[in-house]
Amino acid sequence: MDNLESVYGIPFHGEEHEEPGEEPHGEERIFSTTDSETFNIKGSYNVNGNLINKIDFNYRDSDYTLTEDHEEGDHDEPHDPGEEEHEPTVFLNNAVEYGASFDISNSDLSQNIVVNFVDEDNSIFGEESFMNPANSEEFTVGYYISKDFDLFNVDVGMRLDQIERSGSVTDEEHGDVDYYNVDDSTNSFAASLGRDLSDNLSINIGFASLERLPSVIELFMNGPHMATGRFEIGDPTLGSETSENFDITFNYEKDGFYAYASFYVNDVNNYIALIDQEEHDEEEEEGEEEHHNECHHEEEEEEEGGDPHPHPELICSMYMQEDAEFDGYEFEFGKSFDMDSGVLNLSFGRDVVNAKFSDGHYVPRINPSRNVYAM
């Protein structure tokens, strides 16, 4: 049983442009409080039968709460009774997961069959309830097989997911609610080939074809999210995301010195990304332009006296799909030194990822390159 609570602050938003004669606006900080409760059960039953050797089972029940609240940056000035108060926003995630792994290995092959079920509820309440309550159910069946030959080792894995996501989207202007239900299956496959080139050097080559359905956030998001500074809009018509990944890895170890290097290329069809509209105007197709204009149309109506979009200062961002290619590498090398009172380990590593859409512009929100030093 785990219970974790934390509080952290998100930096002040940047100051907005102020017209001449306007009173300066105080900065605003968003504080987040998380509360996570998890109950886990794991076990194993030794069958020792003709077909099944043992069964590993697991059960997990988790409740996660994230509360975002606002605090004005200027604490010295007295509070203005007419000033707008910000109510907290509460994000709730309740999930139940259970499954089992059946070991059916024999003297020639290592084999496992895995079944798993997840039932997850997501809901948001408060001032920034930018998504209606949504539910996701996933049933997974997987098969893994491994064979060690004299010259190399082969690993193969296959997975079938049956997924159902249900939710709704509320029209910001008219208040109409549209209900959606996504019920589909995905298939994934992965294989790797490994070989020892010498007593100290080994190589592993892998290929994977993966399919992923959009999450409830990507499907049903529709509203302001102050923590990201965006008015985020999902798309219930998003399709599955498929990727093909090729990677090659080298490992070396001798006399306390170790090193590894990995290179990969990943082609993704219908990659799902949150795109800021002001950076995507020229690339949008006709259907996407209509959706984009709808977001800006709300801002225009607010200027005319209405208030369908209460946060026109936020960047309008939409979940979209476009083919993309990822490539990158990572490596690490180091050495261990035996000391009188222990072992000293020194290492250096670096990882780099490049990601571009098919038309050449960069995929947003990709982790920057980093160097890692350790002692």
Predicted feature residues:
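Surface-exposed extracellular loop regions of Gram-negative outer-membrane beta-barrel proteins
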Residues: E19, Q162-G175, N181, D199-F246, ...
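Extracytoplasmic loops and strand-loop junctions of Gram-negative outer membrane beta-barrel proteins
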Residues: E18-E28, T38-F39, H70, D74-H86, ...
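Glycine/serine-rich loop-strand microenvironments at binding/catalytic pocket rims
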Residues: M1-L4, G9-G14, G21, Y252-H280, ...
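Small/polar-residue-rich segments within soluble enzyme cores
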Residues: T249
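Periplasmic-side early beta-strands and strand-to-turn transitions of outer-membrane beta-barrels
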Residues: M1-T34, G49, L66, G175
